[in-house]
């Protein structure tokens, strides 16, 4: 039986697999006559040397409903930037490559820094933020979809299903979040399965049915990097430069729109990308990600007026451990009935590492409750620097016109 269950406070749009991709894309082509759609692809140059990017480019060649594709390129030399431009020129849709390491973009980053905007931390968050600024400079762009560029089994169904809810004229969604299964011969998505979700549920047990926490618990894959939103929402969104990007994005959406305009969409059957090993260092990898996520949660809740004490954090640690143990029991049963490999010992070891990440997050939050500020919404940036949009357009155009 197809899954049609609606849980939580947002709408869930499952894939019943009874409709062809071609039919979906045909509708999107009709919608594109009135609502221009932009696809934003944050990428490192190294991803062009891996197995995922060639497949993504091949799939994008067949899309006809997109107004523009913006590739946000990080960690690339001039030669590598030129190589990427040539590769992306194979796509029929108009493509603009934003070279964040180039001298023109670096000048803009310095100008923003001098004006008091926090853009000093390089990474995906900053690149996405600057790329959004470029896209929003085009008044004809209506909806923006974003997905990562390390998806080995990529299908053009992903952007189609992400964009459909926010551009369909008979629907009223402003934000859609992608979800999928992270399954091969075993379950992946450890940070979501045995850290994020147990932590959210531990917080609910302690703080009660807080609307924000219930909202976060409604997402099937809150840490996915795939989402779409309309420009009027995007222009008021602040973005985190840290690993807390996805959680802070959901927080900003929560504050800037209403539940009935938020949905989650099943975009793929399964999702394969590069898997990170769980190292015990709290300053890198998945543990750093978990720590940043926890700090982001604490700060958002503190903004809502919650007071955190030493007793609260002691209770949270033990409650999280209990919720994580419940999760292990559930995923062990799920793996057994589906014939998957499930290493309970490795999962328990991962929880112990995540407890260290949680302790680190608590310590850093107490020492610095404000932490790394979110990068300002573009509506504020434009108010302070009225010419920034023109400068951004000029920098990208000149970079893309150079031989």
Curated annotation (Swiss-Prot):
Gene3D superfamilies: Spore Coat Polysaccharide Biosynthesis Protein SpsA, Chain A. It comes from the Bacteria. Keywords: Cobalt, Glycosyltransferase, Magnesium, Manganese, Metal-binding, Nickel, Transferase. Optimum temperature is 90 degrees Celsius. GpgS is inactive at 40 degrees Celsius, but the activity increases dramatically above 50 degrees Celsius. At 100 degrees Celsius, GpgS retains 33% of the total activity. (2R)-3-phosphoglycerate binds at residues 189-192. It catalyses: an NDP-alpha-D-glucose + (2R)-3-phosphoglycerate = (2R)-2-O-(alpha-D-glucopyranosyl)-3-phospho-glycerate + a ribonucleoside 5'-diphosphate + H(+). Optimum pH is 8. Requires divalent cations for activity in the following order of efficiency: Mn(2+), Co(2+), Mg(2+) and Ni(2+) ions. SUPFAM superfamilies: Nucleotide-diphospho-sugar transferases. Disulfide bonds: none annotated. Its EC number is 2.4.1.266. Its cofactor is Mn(2+); Co(2+); Mg(2+); Ni(2+). GO terms for molecular function: glycosyltransferase activity; metal ion binding. A divalent metal cation binds at residues 150, 273. InterPro entries: Nucleotide-diphossugar_trans. Homodimer. Belongs to the glycosyltransferase 2 family. Involved in the biosynthesis of 6-O-methylglucose lipopolysaccarides (MGLPs). Catalyzes the transfer of a glucose (Glc) moiety from uridine diphosphate (UDP-Glc) to the position 2 of 3-phospho-D-glycerate (3-PGA) to form glucosyl-3-phosphoglycerate (GPG). GpgS is most active with UDP-glucose, followed by GDP-glucose, ADP-glucose, and to a lesser extent, TDP-glucose. 3-PGA is the only acceptor for these glucosyl donors. This is Glucosyl-3-phosphoglycerate synthase. It comes from Persephonella marina (strain DSM 14350 / EX-H1).
